[in-house]
C-alpha cells in the first residue's frame, strides 16, 4: 500500500510495483542534449537512429505511457488519500471497448505487433495497443524501442502517476500465460520498493537551492574578473569560469528535466527550460528526445550494428566497437579511424559547438506546434543575446571573440569529458536486453567523493542513475553499495573506478578499435 507521503507499507511486491509512483515519482521528461550524450551528435548520421526505428515525426516533450495493474483495485487495505489516488489512477478516462475486456494474448502474438503502425506493449502483464498513440507520444520515438515487448520496468522507471491513467485507454487484454518473473527482475523490483519506503526518491530542496546559489556565484565570479581587468589573462580566467558555470548548470538542468527536484512536472519543466535553453543555449526538446532514447537503449545497435543510441553514432570520426567498425567501407574513413585514440580528447573541445548546431537545427526543422517552436527558438535566441551582449559590452576590441571562443571550447571539454566516462568503452550490443541488464552492462561508475560528486554533477553514479533516473543525485551514493551487491548476485559487472582509470579504459577501447581499423584498411587497399 502507498501513503501520500510516498512510503510503502505492508502489501505484496506486485502491489508495491503497481502503485509505487503514485506518491513518490515524477514524470520522466529528461533534459536537453549534453548530459549523458557524448560526441554522438557530430556524425551526419546522428539523426538516423530515430528514422530507422519509426520514421515518425518528432515531438518536443517527454511524457509517455504507463499503466497500473487491475489488482490495485482489489487492494482493500488501502486507505485515506492513497486509496482515492489509487482509484483515480486505475479508473479509465474513456470507456474501453467491451470486446477487449476479457481477451488474452500470448507473448508470441504481442511480438508480432512491433511496427509503428501496429504496435503493442506489455506493462505488468497487461497488453496495450498504442498504434494510434505512438505518433503522438510526447517522449518521441523512444517508445518504439519497446514495440512488441514487455516494457514494465522501463515504464516504471520513467513515468509519473499521472501517466498510469493514460494507458487504460489502450488496454486490450492480458498476457495469456504469465511466465514466472526472472530472479533478476524480481530482486530489482524489490530493491526499488525498498528505496521508495526509505523516501530516497524525494529531493532535498535545500540541496538544490545551494546548487543554484553555487552556480550563480561561479557566474558572478566570471563577470567580476573581466569587470576588474581587461588583460588577456583575465579574459582567459573569466572564460574558464564561465565554462565551469555552463558545465554545472548543465548538471542542474539535467536534474530538473529528469523530474528529480519537484513533485510537479511543470515546475521541473519551467526551470529546465530556463537553465537549458536560456542560460546554455541548448534545445530542451531536442535533448529530451535524444536522451530518452539513450536511457531506453544505452549503447544498443540494430542487427546490422547501426547505432540506435545516438550517443554512439559517431562515425566517421569515432567507432566505439569492432562491430560498428565492420560497417565502414570507405577507405578514407578507415584511415581516419586508425588514429581515433590520438585525437579523441581534442574533439571534446568542439562538442558544445556540435550540440548548439543540432539544437538550432531542431528548433528550425522539427515538427513542432507554433507555440513550442516559439518557446524553443525564443529561449535559445535569448541565450545568444545575453552571451554575445555581455562579451561585447564588457570587453574591448577583439577580446569578446577570445572570451566567447574559450568559453565554448572549455565548456565542451568539461561536459564531454564526463559523458565519455559513463558509457564509452563499455559493452556495445545488438540484441534486445531487458531493461536492468541493458543499463548495467553499458554503464560505468566513477567512485564517489566530494570532488567527483561535484565535478560530474552526480553522474559519476551513472549505473544508479540509469536504473533510477528520477532519484535525486544526492541519494545516489546512498544506494550504490546495495546496487553493487545486486549486480554481484546476478553475475553483472559493476564497474566502479577512478577518473584516471576510467579515462584509460576509454582510450584503451578506442585504441583497440583503431588497430582493427588499420587492419581493415590494409585488407581493403
From Swiss-Prot:
Gene Ontology cellular component terms for the protein in this record: membrane
Could you tell me which InterPro entries the record lists for this protein?
Cyt_B5-like_heme/steroid-bd, Cyt_B5-like_heme/steroid_sf, FA_desaturase_dom, Fatty_acid_desaturase
Q: Where is this motif: Histidine box-2?
A: 291-295
Transmembrane ranges, per UniProt, are 216-236, 266-286, 340-360, 378-398, 401-421
Q: Phenotype of the disruptant?
A: Increased content in linoleic acid and disappearance of gamma-linolenic and arachidonic acid.
Q: Which UniProt keywords apply?
A: Fatty acid biosynthesis, Fatty acid metabolism, Heme, Iron, Lipid biosynthesis, Lipid metabolism, Membrane, Metal-binding, Oxidoreductase, Transmembrane, Transmembrane helix
This protein's superkingdom?
Eukaryota
GO annotation terms (biological process):
lipid metabolic process; unsaturated fatty acid biosynthetic process
Where in the cell?
Membrane
- Principal cellular location given in the protein's record: membrane
As annotated in the record, motif Histidine box-1 runs over 254-258
Which pathway or pathways does this protein act in?
Lipid metabolism; polyunsaturated fatty acid biosynthesis
The UniProt entry annotates the motif Histidine box-3 at: 462-466
Q: List the disulfide bonds.
A: none
EC number of the protein: 1.14.19.47
Family recorded in the similarity comment: Belongs to the fatty acid desaturase type 1 family.
Q: What the record says about its domains? A: The histidine box domains may contain the active site and/or be involved in metal ion binding.
Q: What is this protein called?
A: Acyl-lipid (9-3)-desaturase
Source organism per entry reads Physcomitrium patens (Spreading-leaved earth moss)
